[in-house]
């Protein structure tokens, strides 16, 4: 019997059905993606087309990994998606992709490079040239209203004298309000530079005009700003820049003198300030001690000029007498010493010559009080000393003057030296020229110095330029970031730097002129990141490899018999894994709290394995080894770490723990992908404009007779990991291909054990190639071949061109396929594979390429959408039959598939071009289905509970009604013989007792449910009772133990209660019901109806129900 409060009956079959549905959906989702039961090893990367990428014609380039990159980006054996970044190149780089005998190349389009080259088309000028502008003086005075701008080409090889082609002209514009002044120059010389001059109008130095209704701006201490711009344009036939010096007052408006064509290409240079005040002569200070200070002109002087040195004393000094000595070399004449305040100071000069030097001694004595009340300056002038530059040995040099002060009875001060710059030229400024604006510090990784050449030039008043690199002095402001050579001819990093920096400064000085060189230094972020496809390596059951001297003698498997252990010198193979080293290049921002800046962005990591390959090692080489710095091979059980060592110190730049387990795994699947050619497509990356995404797709269809194709193979192990077979040594295995239909494809003698070759013979399709993977010949048993794994490859041979490729190509059309195996070139073609039952085996290459790129970038997705419109075919589903799925290995290459699978028999013809809708993937559909089923189950459960609670509340006896209940016994007779009812005879039952007979026949369960769920009104009482006596008696006793009593009830009140309990082995649900009735409705003491007449009893009960 059921207890009260149990779950309602209908929930049990509903929950069971929901459980079955959930299990079926889960099974379908897992089966659809080809995932094995052992999926705990998610560290292994999903399979992809294992092509080799190379970037050609680039000096520095890197392959990239996006942070939190979706593993499903590369999840198809037919395609591989990689992003790369070209840091430095002199010409457009070329991407090369190869696999087996096939290779394909594609030049990176210029619009994907996004270079800031404003020199014009790159077919005339070098690819990496950039134009740099320097404003020589950012302060322009009315006495010298000239602006000079030096331009030079960055990235140009200064030693390449053959690059003397006709360089373009530059036109410079200065704008102030609505007025404009222009000038021009032409790039030339080995350094590729020129100086443009602009003569500003005198009216520009007046205060700016104020329009009506506007307030007059405050005087700007930095001067009136003037914006400078430039444009690039070719010269005329003679190579001249005609009209470069033309000035016009209001030519800024477009449509005047062709300015409409140039203003759209204006490039900003910077801002200069205009000042009306005169440019006073600049003096440099030389402090001898706390009292005496010498002031000398800082500008260079010419031969024959007189230089005046001003000797001053501090205003608060109490010195009354001092002796000043000045010593000069020959070539400088000491003329005179005189004072401007003869009443304040007495001056007496003596000149003495001694060999190569001339010494002047000047005695200065105070005669009167200092004029404190007449001047507020910090220094008072004492004497002026005049020197004449008589001669000099070079065009540019310095003349030193040695100074010393002596105080009577106090001694002398230290010697101080000042320099007078001698030059026959009027220099405006110096400019350090660099090949680039930034430097990549890879010396930290390789130990090789990275240097950048430097040139320093001077510019004169007449815009003449001279190389003064050998005469300058230089110093780095922070040698922990960047260093400069002693000869100041290059800056460099040698790997001992500890940080990078934005706009690191190296100062260059020539005479009194100085100029900074700002360079951004990028350094790798430490520690480096080591990425291993599988950090736990196990032995592979059945794969025995020969033992050589550099391999450990692996312990034999305990499961192998004695025949396998005889002296063959073989041991079990360990799993292999791929290894690569990643990092980010960072640079500190300007200021003390500068945030780090990233090359590209924080979301990108650079593959630097090729840079640190020589410095990678394993701490325990006997546990595992590295092959070519990219393949990890287990040797024996243990734990070790992969380390990247610093080439310059004993420090460790990165490490990764590797475990070689004692467990054994087996090869569960051998995935086969036909490769008849390769095609490559390049797309811009939406995350960063400097990165380029490449998609290489394998061609599956053989289209010409005798065309050859190879196979790409992946191994799947019982631990869930997958690995390309290419990383294993070809000496340890061999692949043998067998054709299932020689009329379609044949298998010639393979040229390489890694790539079996198939040849097209006739049209056909299906799983026509069987590939057997066997262990090395030296480890084969004598009686039988040791086949490690078997794979079945799908082949499609269709002669003729693909109609889907007849549409014209776009900017990012796939490159041509270079089939070196068959010495052909084909356009990238899309195809389908159909099984023998007419169902589709694989999606088209475009659709699978879309699946691989689905999460790559937004821009790539949009481009692929356009490509589907042109080239997609409506025959790309994988709906193979059951029999075929049993013979084909699980296709985990589409784990999980991103493509939409068209239904078979959709009515689309083979060659129809349609726009394929891009819906949800199988994984997404499965997850949404699970979510919907769960929500439905919860909703049904809540509704069922609410329904049961509502019915229970309506049928429960009120508390006040219990007082009117009778003491009479209510009986429920449970028997298994129909004769028990008739044996009661005609004797009526006691007035206070009632017996209800429940039939347990085959149909009674359903009928009892119907009766109880309809409020307890009995429509049928069957006379056949099929039930065991033990069960009925037990249940009868149980209900006798729990009668309902009420001392206040009347004798005629009858309570009718029915309990029914279903044994566990019965198929009927358990139902509980409570029925209450008044004595006016039911009278159980019946004088006119015999108890033994069930038909009459049923009729009587029906009458009572009708009356109610």
Curated annotation (Swiss-Prot):
Its main location: membrane. Residues 1-27 form the signal peptide. It is found in: Membrane. Residues 820-857, 1022-1072 are annotated as: Disordered. Keywords: Glycoprotein, Membrane, Signal, Transmembrane, Transmembrane helix. Residues 820-836 have a biased composition (Basic and acidic residues). The chain crosses the membrane at residues 923-943. Residues 944-1108 are cytoplasmic. It is a single-pass type I membrane protein. The keyword Membrane applies. Glycans are attached at residues 316, 373. Residues 28-922 are extracellular. InterPro entries: Ig_TMEM132_2nd, Ig_TMEM132_5th, Ig_TMEM132_6th, TMEM132, TMEM132_3rd, TMEM132_C, TMEM132_M, TMEM132_N. GO terms for cellular component: membrane. Belongs to the TMEM132 family. This is Transmembrane protein 132C.
